[in-house]
Amino acid sequence: MTQAVRDGMGSSSDAQRRIRRSPLLFTAPLIFLVLLSAVLIWEMTRANVSAEARTEWPWRLQLIAPEALGSLLAVAAGAVLARAQYARTVSPYLGWRGAWVKGQLAENASAWRVGILNGGQHLAVVESWDCRVVMTGARDLAGAPWGSVRSTAAELTDAGLVDGEDFRLIAFGAGFPLVGAGAGYETVLMGAFSENFVARVQSLYVRVRITDVVGDTHERIMDCMKGIGATGDRTAG
C-alpha cells in the first residue's frame, strides 16, 4: 500500500483555540486595572470642578492620592501586558500526525497510526479527552454527544469492529503531561486503525482539552480519519 502521511499542525478546520483563561492569573489583574481606571476617571472629573464644589458631597470624596494612583495604574497595566506576553510564550501547540505503518495491530498488516504532540516549548496537562464516531454513510451532526474512549470503543465493537484487531484507542486521563516537543516531531500514540476500520468509519473525532502553565485551557478537535486518501507527504499550514 502506498504510504500516506498527514500532519494536523494548524489546520484551519480543526484549529486549536483558547476556551478559558485562568480567573486568578488573568481575570483578577484585569478587574484591578479596570477599577483603577474608573478611579482615575473619577479623580480627573473631580479635579475639573471648582474648589467650592469640592467641599460638598460627593466631590469632596478623594479615593486615592494622584501620585499613588499613577504608580498603581502603571504596575497593573504592566502586569496585564506581561501576563499576556508570557501566556503567548508558554502556549502549547497541539499537532497530530497520521501515517500507514506496519506492526501496530497485526504484525504484517498496514494500519493507520495517529499520534499527537505538543509543539510548544512548555509542558501542558490533559484536562479532558473525548471521542465521537461517525460511521460511513451516517450524518455527521455537529451537536452529537461526546463520549469517553471506553464508550467509543464499546460503540465500535457494537458496530462489528474488533478491539485490538480493527482498532486500538489510547485513553489519556486528566493530568497526563504532554511535554513540549521542542525541535522534535515525535508523537504519542492516540490510536491505530485497520483498513477494515478505515472503510467502515467516516470520521473519528478526538476532542483534547489541555491546561498550560499559566492556567489557560486550550482545545483542539482532530479527525483521526482525515487525510487517509492522501499520497506522499502532506503538511497542513
Briefly describe each language-model feature range:
Residues 135-138, 155-166, 226-237:
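Short, surface-exposed linear segments at secondary-structure transitions and domain or protein termini
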Residues 133-151:
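Short aromatic-acidic-glycine turn motif
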Residues 2-14, 207-237:
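Acidic, serine/threonine- and proline-rich intrinsically disordered appendage/tail regions
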Residues 107-113, 185-188, 203-205:
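Short, solvent-exposed loop/turn segments enriched in Ser/Thr/Gly
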Residues 146-194:
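Intrinsically disordered, low-complexity Pro/Gly/Ser/Thr-rich segments with frequent PxxP/GP/PP motifs
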Residues 193-215:
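Serine/threonine-enriched low-complexity regions used as flexible
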Residues 2-127, 131-134, 237:
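Membrane-proximal alpha-helical anchors
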